[in-house]
From Swiss-Prot:
Domain Tudor, chain residue ranges per copy: 149-260, 386-506
Protein name as annotated: Putative protein tag-250
A Pfam family this chain is assigned to: TUDOR
Gene Ontology annotations of biological process type: P granule organization; piRNA processing; spermatogenesis
Gene3D superfamilies in UniProt: 2.30.30.140, 2.40.50.90
Gene Ontology CC: one annotated term: P granule
Coiled-coil segments on the chain, per record: none
Length: 610
């Protein structure tokens, strides 16, 4: 596959069922937009930016009419256009004339496959899939409205999601194997499909039924059964995970039709039941932390896992409110009774990512127990802890092709809790620095409107009150004054640096050697900014993982890897921009035209800093 082809996205709109406007006015709009993209945005453009440019160049000058509300659907109904939705962003592309259509399936978190098919679906097949999309989601939702029979008084349960003692979700331990099996079975089903096809289980944005049941693949590649709570907005759907209790927004591209009702996946109702304890609203707010302490166990690495409890009471007699439950610990302790007992110290809880996450709502703290009299210790993750196959990650900092900081997506939402706890701890009087920081010691520093964990490197040679620090969770150096530094809580469960470093593999500078141009550094940074926080797929290449070697920087894991984001391989993109060469390509002569290549502006997406 050529570098340019590698940048072509998948087509997401189902053109067979769309009502295409073939009026003269709409055809004129298509022609204008086609020329705009072809001339100004040959590598694609965000639909919102294209709309703004169209209005600026044509509508405001009286040269064209306003775009209709469904203009994206109407434009992409034509074969000359292709579109890709990533989160809230729709990116439009055009096909050059006299070329065949190239389609790529949605990007998988683990691997990338390109599959094509020449068979046209029959009329009966199209009718059947249309009926499935219209009827099955509603019918499946009725099935999932029923609860698993394993959830009853006397059963062993765990809390899989919690807002407070007044609202949380429980799941029977007996259902855990079935829960894992459903995810595995769904993965096998969708792996056998050969998209893009009018007959696969993908669902277009206008086909989502509010209240309907679907399958959903999260950023880690795991499949779940969900209910679409609302119609899609900005390309995303609010989904309730019926077997976990979580409610989150996900892009339409991650959603599929569930198997037919006769399939074993649909033989069991929802496994997570929303319940409450017999406490008042006031007690619920006051007892949040204690509730988490009693029902979750914090491991040495800060990860919280739910404790197995016995469902000793289940009262669903009041149909207008949530069932009232009580839970017992292994030693027969009633959680409700213990919650209401007066207690001395309530420690700072740190809900972090588990297989069943607790939301930040449960992380409010009424009192903090922290120790600042001992030095804090923070260690990098080891090379052995890093994945060997492709995995999704968040981009944090990008200095250039050889210095990119990322964090495994599987660690979310742990960083959110870590930063929230760090903010609370730095507000305590005991965290104030009474003397100069120790070189090599770990501290907190207020940088870019946020408290960051840092390692103090040395004093500034210009400002005696400033210090050079290394941001442990960002991977960059910064200067900060002493008054903006705090001591770290030595009892904090967050003992690891979550960041790792990466170098883009398979490419080299166009001028040869190891030095990259200033333009290539800027392009890498702008690439990730344009992605608006979308996950990056990291595919490590040989020789695998090693330790980052930079003077005064921690030895965090690092690797050379292929990186892709929003369906684009950044290495291929740099090559297409004339900023890099394939690793095995010969170095062009100084007068070579390739060294004089015009560098196009990256996709103009309203982005944010990474």
């Amino acid at each position: 596959m050529s570098a340019v082809n590698g940048l072509v996205p998948s087509t997401i709109f189902d053109r067979i069922n769309s009502d295409m406007d073939v009026s003269e006015e709409m055809e004129e709009i298509r022609e204008v937009l086609y020329e705009m993209i072809k001339t100004n945005f040959p590598m694609g453009v965000a639909a919102t930016h294209l709309s703004e440019k169209y209005h600026e160049e044509f509508v405001s000058k009286g040269l064209g009419r306003e775009l209709p509300e469904d203009w994206i659907q109407q434009v992409t109904a034509a074969e000359e256009f292709e579109a890709q939705t990533r989160g809230p962003i729709t990116i439009l592309f055009v096909r050059l004339s006299n070329t065949s259509s190239f389609k790529r399936p949605p990007i998988n978190s683990v691997n990338v496959r390109v599959i094509s098919t020449d068979r046209e679906p029959t009329a009966d097949e199209l009718k059947k899939i249309k009926q499935r999309k219209e009827n099955e989601p509603t019918e499946h939702a009725k099935t999932l409205s029923q609860q698993s029979v394993a959830l009853k008084e006397g059963s062993t349960v765990s809390i899989v999601y919690a807002d407070s003692p007044k609202r949380f979700f429980i799941r029977a331990l007996a259902d855990d194997d079935q829960y894992e099996k459903i995810g595995t079975t769904l993965a096998e089903i969708y792996a056998q499909e050969t998209p893009p096809s009018a007959l696969d289980s993908r669902v277009a944005i206008y086909e989502i039924v509010a209240g309907g049941a679907y399958a959903l693949q999260d950023s880690n590649g795991t499949w779940f059964r969900v209910i679409a709570k609302q119609p899609p907005q900005s390309g995303q759907v609010m989904c309730h995970f019926v077997d976990v209790g979580v409610c989150e927004k996900f892009p339409v591209a991650a959603i599929r039709l569930l198997p037919p009702a006769v399939h074993p996946v649909m033989s069991i109702g929802s496994m997570a039941r929303e319940v409450r304890m017999d406490v008042s609203e006031e007690e619920s707010l006051r007892l949040n932390n204690k509730f988490v302490d009693l029902t979750f166990e914090t491991k040495d690495d800060g990860i919280q896992v739910p404790i197995n409890l016995t469902l000793s009471k289940f009262d669903s007699s009041d149909s207008e409110s949530l069932p009232v439950v009580d839970l017992q610990s292994s030693d027969g302790l009633s959680i409700t009774e213990f919650l209401k007992k007066p207690s001395g110290v309530v420690r700072l809880s740190t809900p972090t990512k588990t297989t069943s996450p607790i939301t930040p709502a449960s992380a409010s703290t009424s009192s903090l127990t922290c120790l600042f009299d001992k030095p804090a210790t923070i260690q990098p993750m080891t090379v052995a802890q890093m994945p060997m196959s492709a995995f999704p990650a968040n981009a944090i900092f990008a200095a250039g092709p050889t210095d990119i900081s990322l964090r495994q997506l599987s660690l979310d939402p742990m960083p959110d809790y870590m930063y929230a706890k760090l903010k609370d701890e730095c507000a305590l009087p005991d965290s104030q620095l009474e003397s100069s920081p120790d070189f090599g010691g770990f501290y907190a520093a207020f940088i870019d409107d946020r408290w960051e964990r840092v390692q103090c490197i040395r004093a500034s040679k210009i400002d005696k009150q400033a210090y050079c620090v290394y941001l442990l969770d960002v991977g960059a150096f910064q200067y900060v004054r002493k008054e903006a530094m705090r001591r770290l809580n030595s009892t904090s469960p967050f003992k690891k640096m979550l960041m790792f470093k990466c170098k883009i593999g398979g490419i080299k500078p166009v001028a040869g050697g190891e030095v990259w141009s200033r333009e290539s550094h800027e392009a890498v940074r702008e690439f990730f900014e344009a992605a608006c926080g979308e996950p990056v797929v990291v595919e490590p290449t040989q020789p695998g993982w090693s330790q980052w070697k930079q003077l005064n920087a921690p030895a965090v894991p690092t690797c050379e890897a292929r990186l892709s984001c929003c369906g684009r391989d950044i290495g291929d993109w740099l090559i297409a921009c004339g900023l890099a060469l394939p690793i095995n390509a010969p170095i062009p002569s100084p007068n070579s035209q390739s060294l004089l290549t015009f560098v196009p502006t990256p996709i103009n997406i309203v982005g944010r800093n990474i």
